[in-house]
Amino acid sequence: HSIRRRQRQMCIRDRERRRGRIVNLSSIAGRFVTPGAGWYGASKHALEGISDALRLELHSFGLQVVLVEPGLIRTGFEAVSEVSLQQQSTDPVWGPMMCRVAASWADGFRRGSSPELVARTIASALETSNPKPRYRCGKESEALVLQRFIPTELWDALVRRRTIG
């Protein structure tokens, strides 16, 4: 709710000036999820939907809405998610898969891009006179392009192979 509340405050102020820009920070998980990240992906997917709707709704007021979709970024997020995965790893049914997911995530975040890349992407989205609706950045973000061109079954197989073996 805090995102919506802040956006509403900005819209009231910027609508009168007939210019302004909202930059929402999402994740590639908003467009595709991996095993073990369903709830996180759902929250990011919701932010993507809100951003798309706002972009359409606010256009006539001269307001722009931009979405930044980072891939794997070295932020320490893996330490937070590791706690959840470790709790699930004790389950006799889900445990073996969650251990493989945890190993996959740890490897991915180790190879992740720097947070500075996201900061530069946000700055670019703010500074350009004609921003794109979406900006991808960071490791694995190119997967968003690939996902659009292959059948769902093949995509699922690729994700499963990379995350749960």
Q: At which residue positions do the language-model features occur?
A:
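Hydrophobic alpha-helix immediately C-terminal to the catalytic Tyr-X-X-X-Lys motif of short-chain
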Residues: 46, 50-58, 68
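C-terminal beta-strand-loop-alpha-helix "lid" module of Rossmann-like NAD(P)-dependent dehydrogenases
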Residues: 60-109
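Helix-to-beta-strand junctions that scaffold the AdoMet/dcAdoMet cofactor pocket
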Residues: 14-17, 59
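Active-site loop immediately N-terminal to the catalytic Tyr-X3-Lys motif
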Residues: 32-38
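Single conserved hydrophobic/aromatic residue that forms the stacking wall/gate
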Residues: 1-8, 12-14
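Core catalytic loop region at the nicotinamide-binding pocket of NAD(P)H-dependent oxidoreductases
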Residues: 65, 103-149
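Residue(s) in the substrate-gating loop at a strand-loop-helix junction
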Residues: 27
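Active-site helix of classical SDR
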Residues: 43
